[in-house]
């Protein structure tokens, strides 16, 4: 195609120009040609210069109207009709089929589509400065250069066609095709920049269509329809460009589409429309890529269009209606959202009361958390809807609509005013023209009459000359008057013409101004709609994004529940009396005055004198029955000393399952005191199920200890209230002055209580849940604990580990190591918040024995998560994550090398290498961070060692603690994509630290109790004392093999724990109950050698007492038992003299040994 066009052009002997009107016209000279070409080249650069390196998006395509707009031609003076006007050259008919492709301009070079006969303007100069005829090259060298460039462009299109339509390299064809298209467009841009007159609408439109077809082409499928469309687009751009080159060489350039710029308005020149850039570059194709024309081109197009202002005003009016419809839609939708959120809140409130009414229900914590999340979602949605209505959408859009309507009406009024002025001027012009015509006719008639009178006077006789003279004079006066009137009418007519021209020009000025103002108003409204829409959908995303995470969390937590777990817990917590044994024996009839031997035997089956009180010291031992009547020999009377118990003395007929004997009324029920010296409400020695596991007989004399001092019963104004264990440690009195409650953090005015020693204030109703113990000194103010810098919290601890970490870890290790899902299952939010508040109010004095293990673990995770900088500093994050990535990559490579089979030795080598590298990196941590991290990981290692029970593997703990202990430096985004991607790597680091704890911190982790046992079930070893049983070494009593999980969960069995006593009693079968009814559980030893030394465990409060005793001691060298008994003045001492051999629970059997030389032992 291009070669044929080239041959035709080379055969052209000269360059001629056809005149559309058919009349001959002078040909332009050579210098004129050159100057015209120079002017054309000096115009702004083609927008293809702005094409990005990658391909632009599909250009929009619209069909332009083939209409000639009014007001575009220049008004010529009446006397200049002989001058040839600006040429309006007609497009060759052979190219008329491509006119529809020029729908609208794609460049900023003012190439507007105004019909088939319109072309882009030559320059940006005013119409008076334009040449009257088109320009073209005059030198053969220019033609040869142009044809060479055209040949390069044709070669680029051929390469593009081959690349797109080839059948091989399916995957590599797309980038190769884009590269070929970019090369062809680059050549085309160079040609247009060199010859600006080739920048036609048809060429740019065809280029946009070709770009769209190439980008939308499916290279992986053989679609004939797409290939046909691509070939058609390729042919279209070739034909359009070759036609432009032909017209350029023939000189057929149309300049009739120039903008009619109002005189005197320099701001509307083409230079100012394109901007004051250094090179005058017009708007780039980026604007076209975005789907809209540059603002200046839109105004110019409407200026040339008939009724352009009315069309713009109509669009502005429709836009105001559109904004109103948007506001209506969002109002209705937000109303529905508000109703749903309020209904959800109301439903959650009502259901929460009914759902949480009964404890120990299946998945109760899951649904409690779900209800809390529903409440939070409803509250957040209500706030979001309120924000939408008042700040981000409704109000701004409503104000913008009102302003939009106001400005539209003002612009419309100004436009109509200008139109009315022009109409008045045109009406005056028509009237003046009519008057002028009438006066001229009257003047002509008067002149005719004067001429006729003169002829009559010349033909009359000399005697009648006076009458003719008078008639002539009269007609001359009339002719003079008619002439004057005609001149006045002509002057009026000229004035009206000038006024009409002025009003017409003013109308054009008003049109330009109105279009600019309308577009400004529309753009402002567009921006407001855009901002409001972004704010709306962003807010909706923020409200709905957490929902999938919450549902996934609830799903994972629900998977950890075992069916029947809550029912078992409910049965274990039942405080019911034992069902009495009913015997159906034959009883022969006896007389009314005689008793049956069977009845006498039943009445004498229990002798209460076996239960020796303080006054029974020195009395001979008596034989009595135990739980099932098995005889047990007692030795307490022969000991000659009294010791104190750390639990209450309680006897009950129903609880013991025995009939009361004589003297049973001498026993009183005492309540146990806590180790801090005051009463405890929940430590009464009563089995939760009301069973015989801790009978009254055992309670009265367990471990051979009898009360030495009376235990104080709670007194004062709150003695009849239900007090928590921590509340019973305070000396309470009525509140005297208003204060803030340390439990619920609200003010107390009436019905309040305060401690006489620590001045703690609390509501009366809050005493049931109070978790802060009495410190026997004034309680300090509230501490900002959560969210505080870690160095401040660790500064107060001697070893660098904050007290909250120690407190939570110790409590979990004491009674929740074997709890299933520990750290994985979330606690109840309200209880967790109360515990956090208690830690900030009471610090180390918080009582955790009544808290749920999951709540305690949640508090610990929350504290670590809210640290401004995690335990593992930000500066180590990227190195640790990179190390985890390398480790995972190495494992994957090793697995691939072994053909998919996991080699444990290679994986272990990779993990050990990673652990060594972790050890080197963690040495850079601050001392307090490293100490706390080591303390926490030692605890997690202990949890992993019993993973068969708690189901918490190192991987699970890594998933939980990875984002908590190791997280990147925070950014502006709520959740960055990189942090989500790094979750597996964070978990990998923590998992390696747990598994290789000893290698990382260069010490061996402590083994849990039972770890030294040869049996594989890892049962806890229980050391018990049998004060009333004399047996030699090697006496063995079998135990039940099936013990409840509750007994195995406790790592250290304390003498102060009721649950430990209850669990130990459940370990014994009914056949050995008589022999083991007075067992005392001691702490398990760390090794086989230390088992014989019977070193007991200490609770947190006992350690506090020992520390105080050492500080207040007088330096004597008394035994620890003497110092402790001297310190405990109002509570039972924990001194236990155990001269008899200890009993050990090993492998489901109890082994007794003899050890006569025993020292007092701390329990």
From Swiss-Prot:
Keywords: Cell membrane, Cell projection, Coiled coil, Cytoplasm, GTPase activation, Membrane, Metal-binding, Phosphoprotein, Zinc, Zinc-finger. Residues 458-470, 673-682, 1087-1099 have a biased composition (Low complexity). It is found in: Cytoplasm; Cell projection, Ruffle membrane. PROSITE patterns: F_BAR (PS51741), RHOGAP (PS50238), ZF_DAG_PE_1 (PS00479), ZF_DAG_PE_2 (PS50081). Pfam families: GMIP-like_FCH, RHG29_45_N, RhoGAP. The modification Phosphoserine is found at residues 23, 25, 100, 120, 126, 596, 605, 619, 646, 976, 1054, 1057, 1059. This is Rho GTPase-activating protein 45.
């Amino acid at each position: 195609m291009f070669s044929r066009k080239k041959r035709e052009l080379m055969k052209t002997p000269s360059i001629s120009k056809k005149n559309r009107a058919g009349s001959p016209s002078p040909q332009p000279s050579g210098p004129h040609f050159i100057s015209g070409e120079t002017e054309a080249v000096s115009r702004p650069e083609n927008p293809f210069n702005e094409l990005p390196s990658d391909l632009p998006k599909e250009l929009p395509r619209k069909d332009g109207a083939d209409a000639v707009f009014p007001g575009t031609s220049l008004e010529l003076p009446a006397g200049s009709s002989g001058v040839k006007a600006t040429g309006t050259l007609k497009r060759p008919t052979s190219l008329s089929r491509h006119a529809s492709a020029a729908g609208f301009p794609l460049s900023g070079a003012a190439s507007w589509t105004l019909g088939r006969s319109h072309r882009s303007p030559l320059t940006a100069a005013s119409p008076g400065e334009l040449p009257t005829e088109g320009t073209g090259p005059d030198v053969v060298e220019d033609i040869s250069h142009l044809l060479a460039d055209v040949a390069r462009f044709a070669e680029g299109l051929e390469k593009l066609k081959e690349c797109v339509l080839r059948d091989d390299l399916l995957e590599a064809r797309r980038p190769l095709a884009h590269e070929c298209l970019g090369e062809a467009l680059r050549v085309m841009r160079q040609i247009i920049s060199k010859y600006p007159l080739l920048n036609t609408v048809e060429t740019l439109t065809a280029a946009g269509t070709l770009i769209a077809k190439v980008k939308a082409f499916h290279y992986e499928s053989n679609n004939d329809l797409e290939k046909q469309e691509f070939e058609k687009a390729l042919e279209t751009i070739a034909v359009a460009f070759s036609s432009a080159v032909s017209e350029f060489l023939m000189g057929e350039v149309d300049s009739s589409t120039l903008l009619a710029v109002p005189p005197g308005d320099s701001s509307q020149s083409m230079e100012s429309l394109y901007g004051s850039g250094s090179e005058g570059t017009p708007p780039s194709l980026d604007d076209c890529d975005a789907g809209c024309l540059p603002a200046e081109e839109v105004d110019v197009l409407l200026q040339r269009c008939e009724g352009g202002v009315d069309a713009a005003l109509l669009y502005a009016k429709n836009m105001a209606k559109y904004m109103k419809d948007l506001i209506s839609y969002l109002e209705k939708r937000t109303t529905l959202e508000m109703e749903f959120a309020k209904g959800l809140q109301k439903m959650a409130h009502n259901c929460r009361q009914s759902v949480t009414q009964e404890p120990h229900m299946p998945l109760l914590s899951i649904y409690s958390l779900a209800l809390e999340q529903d409440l939070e979602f409803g509250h957040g949605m209500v706030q979001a809807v309120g924000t939408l209505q008042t700040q981000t959408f409704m109000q701004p859009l409503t104000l913008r609509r009102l302003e939009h309507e106001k400005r539209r009406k003002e612009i419309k009024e100004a436009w109509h005013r200008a139109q009315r002025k022009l109409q008045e001027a045109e009406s005056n012009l028509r009237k003046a023209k009519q008057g002028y015509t009438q006066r001229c006719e009257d003047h002509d008639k008067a002149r005719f009459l004067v001429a006729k009178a003169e002829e009559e006077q010349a033909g009359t006789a000399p005697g009648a000359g006076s009458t003719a003279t008078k008639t002539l004079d009269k007609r001359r006066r009339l002719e003079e008057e008619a002439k004057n009137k005609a001149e006045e009418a002509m002057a009026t007519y000229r004035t009206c013409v000038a006024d009409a021209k002025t009003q017409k020009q003013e109308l054009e000025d008003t049109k330009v101004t109105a279009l600019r103002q309308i577009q400004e108003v529309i753009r402002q409204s567009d921006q407001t709609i855009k901002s409001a829409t972004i704010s709306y959908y962003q807010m909706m995303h923020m409200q709905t994004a957490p929902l999938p995470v919450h549902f996934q969390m609830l799903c994972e937590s629900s998977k950890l529940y075992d069916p029947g777990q809550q029912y078992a817990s409910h049965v274990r917590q039942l405080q019911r009396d034992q069902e009495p044994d009913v015997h159906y024996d034959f009883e022969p009839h006896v007389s009314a005055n005689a008793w049956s031997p069977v009845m006498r035997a039943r009445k004498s089956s229990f002798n209460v004198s076996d239960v020796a009180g303080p006054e029974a010291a020195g009395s001979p031992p008596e034989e009595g029955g135990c739980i099932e009547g098995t005889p047990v020999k007692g030795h307490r009377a022969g000991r000659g000393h009294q010791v104190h118990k750390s639990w209450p003395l309680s006897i009950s007929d129903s609880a013991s399952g025995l009939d009361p004997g004589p003297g049973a009324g001498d026993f009183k029920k005492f309540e146990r005191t806590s180790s801090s010296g005051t009463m405890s409400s929940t430590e009464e020695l009563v089995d939760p199920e009301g069973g015989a596991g801790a009978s009254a007989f055992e309670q009265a004399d367990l471990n051979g200890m009898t009360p030495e001092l009376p235990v104080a019963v709670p007194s004062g104004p709150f003695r009849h209230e239900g007090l928590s264990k921590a509340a019973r440690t305070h000396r309470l009195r009525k509140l005297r002055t208003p204060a803030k409650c340390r439990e619920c953090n609200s003010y107390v005015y009436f019905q309040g209580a305060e401690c006489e020693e620590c001045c703690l204030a609390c509501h009366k109703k809050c005493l049931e849940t109070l978790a802060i113990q009495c410190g026997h000194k004034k309680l300090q103010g509230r501490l900002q604990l959560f969210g505080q810098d870690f160095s401040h919290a660790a500064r107060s601890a001697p070893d660098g580990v904050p007290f909250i970490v120690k407190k939570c870890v110790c409590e979990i290790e004491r009674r929740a190591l074997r709890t299933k899902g520990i750290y994985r299952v979330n606690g109840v939010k309200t209880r967790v918040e109360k515990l956090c508040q208690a830690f900030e109010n009471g610090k180390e004095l918080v009582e955790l024995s009544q808290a749920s293990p999951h709540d305690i673990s949640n508090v610990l995770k929350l504290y670590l998560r809210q640290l401004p900088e995690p335990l593992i500093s930000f500066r180590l994050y990227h190195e640790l994550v990179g190390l985890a990535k390398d480790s995972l990559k190495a494992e994957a490579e090793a697995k691939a090398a072994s053909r998919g089979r996991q080699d444990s030795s290679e994986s272990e080598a990779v993990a050990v290498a990673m652990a060594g590298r972790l050890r080197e990196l963690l040495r850079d941590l601050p001392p307090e961070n490293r100490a706390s991290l080591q303390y926490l990981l030692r605890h997690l290692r202990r949890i992993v060692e019993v993973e068969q029970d708690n189901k918490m593997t190192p991987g699970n703990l890594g998933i939980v603690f990875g984002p908590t202990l190791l997280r990147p430096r925070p950014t502006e985004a709520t959740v960055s994509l990189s942090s989500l991607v790094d979750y597996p790597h964070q978990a990998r680091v923590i998992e390696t630290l747990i598994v290789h704890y000893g290698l990382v911190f260069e010490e061996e982790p402590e083994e849990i109790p039972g770890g030294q046992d040869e049996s594989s079930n890892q049962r806890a070893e229980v050391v018990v004392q049998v004060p009333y049983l004399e047996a030699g070494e090697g006496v063995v009593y079998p135990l039940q093999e099936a013990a409840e999980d509750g007994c195995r969960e406790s790592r250290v069995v304390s003498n102060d724990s009721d649950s430990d006593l209850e669990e130990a009693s459940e370990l014994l079968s009914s056949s050995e109950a008589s022999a083991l009814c007075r067992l005392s559980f001691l702490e398990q030893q760390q090794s086989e050698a230390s088992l014989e030394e019977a070193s007991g465990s200490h609770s947190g409060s006992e350690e506090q007492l020992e520390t105080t005793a050492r500080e207040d001691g007088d330096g004597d060298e008394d035994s620890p038992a003497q110092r402790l008994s001297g310190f405990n003045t109002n509570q039972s001492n924990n001194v236990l003299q155990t001269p008899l051999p200890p009993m050990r629970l090993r492998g489901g059997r109890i082994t007794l040994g003899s050890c006569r030389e025993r020292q007092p032992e701390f329990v």
